[in-house]
Amino acid sequence: MSEDRQGRSTDTGKILYCSFCGKSQHEVRKLIAGPSVFICDECVELCNDIIREELEEKAQSARSSLPKPREILEVLDQYVIGQNRAKRTLAVAVYNHYKRIESRQKNDEVELAKSNILLVGPTGSGKTLLAETLARLLNVPFTMADATTLTEAGYVGEDVENIIQKLLQKCDYDVEKAQQGIVYIDEIDKISRKSENPSITRDVSGEGVQQALLKLIEGTVASVPPQGGRKHPQQEFLQVDTKNILFICGGAFAGLDKVIQARSTDVGSIGFGAKVKSAERKQEVGKVLAEVEPEDLIKFGLIPEFVGRLPVVATLEELDEPALIKILTEPKNAITKQFKKLFEMENVELEFRPDALSAIARKALKRKTGARGLRTIVESVLLDTMYDLPSQENVSKVVVDESVIEHKSEPYLIYQTPAAPEQKAAGAE
């Protein structure tokens, strides 16, 4: 006797039965054949239900251990220096977001609205790091997207649904996991519309992208090609519901402070009785940004519907010299700690003098790169030393001071010899 893959007997008169429930081939729709066993479609469905219930139980147990806002803030403090107001805002918003997901599963009568987040702050102030740290803490899939590469569907560039595809890739195409992930969209200020007045021409990388992002951010079912394939009509798509995905949008919004100041200044105050803006107020960009209102974002170039989808706004302050010095030394993964670890692997101690840290911070401020530029400065100063060090012997310590940062001298190498330690500058004869 022989059977095909659906369990149909090729010999007449022979009835086949499911090896699990015992039902015959006439009582079920499908009977799938394995090596000497059969399973019916009903048993397959039952197995799927059992697996699905176990996955839901795991997800619920993971959510029951959701850290409280105070605990989220404590973790953020370990990695991000300063920006206390922004960190508190994020901690509360993220906690409420995942509580909202829990509420939806309980089918409560009151439906909680989704609260996506907008981060406003200068380059290098910690926007991306905050989003990354949150995702790592909550153990959820996380992906980043650059708004400047996005275009409307049908135009050259990335489709907005590619963002969801990247999120799926981060969790090995597990749709359930992806539907509770975090998406960070950077440079969101770069897709502001080119003028306040509606244009008769298409703005495919500005207002057009904002329109395309609206439904995705609010909550829709996105069709994503499996395993990163290209879309074509005959293809089956993965359906990803974005209503529980937390979207965090970030941007520098250069010039937004001027928009806020223009609003807060009395328009009618002209002539001798006019209020004069002080130079001090002009310099306090961080404090000005903290007063941002939805109307300011609309004036800047975001469409009203898009601003409405980002109800939580957190502003970050520009980092000053003391804050940059703390960033160099205090976080768990501080830059100086990372380089010290690299030198430890060569059995060499690395020391940064206090004046060196100040010089690094001043240089980063001068370049207007914020915390992002700190690593570049340290890397350039230690490059030659890291190149030569593995080939040198008896080096016990490397010292970096202000003169090294200013490129007036090389890092100081301290040699350990059996007789006595000898100190000299690298490259000295």
Curated annotation (Swiss-Prot):
One of its GO terms (molecular function) is ATP binding. PROSITE patterns: CLPX_ZB. ATP binds at P122, T123, G124, S125, G126, K127, T128, L129. Keywords: ATP-binding, Chaperone, Metal-binding, Nucleotide-binding, Zinc. Gene3D superfamilies: 1.10.8.60, ClpX chaperone, C4-type zinc finger domain, P-loop containing nucleotide triphosphate hydrolases. GO terms for biological process: cell division; proteolysis involved in protein catabolic process. One of its GO terms (cellular component) is HslUV protease complex. SMART domains: AAA (SM00382), ClpB_D2-small (SM01086), zf-C4_ClpX (SM00994). It comes from the Bacteria. It holds the Pfam family zf-C4_ClpX. Signal peptide: none annotated. Residues 6-59 form the ClpX-type ZB domain. Zn(2+) binds at C18, C21, C40, C43. ATP-dependent specificity component of the Clp protease. It directs the protease to specific substrates. Can perform chaperone functions in the absence of ClpP. PANTHER family: ATP-DEPENDENT CLP PROTEASE ATP-BINDING SUBUNIT CLPX-LIKE, MITOCHONDRIAL, ATP-DEPENDENT CLP PROTEASE ATP-BINDING SUBUNIT CLPX-LIKE, MITOCHONDRIAL-RELATED. Belongs to the ClpX chaperone family. This is ATP-dependent Clp protease ATP-binding subunit ClpX. The lineage of its organism: Bacteria, Pseudomonadati, Pseudomonadota, Gammaproteobacteria, Lysobacterales. The gene is clpX.
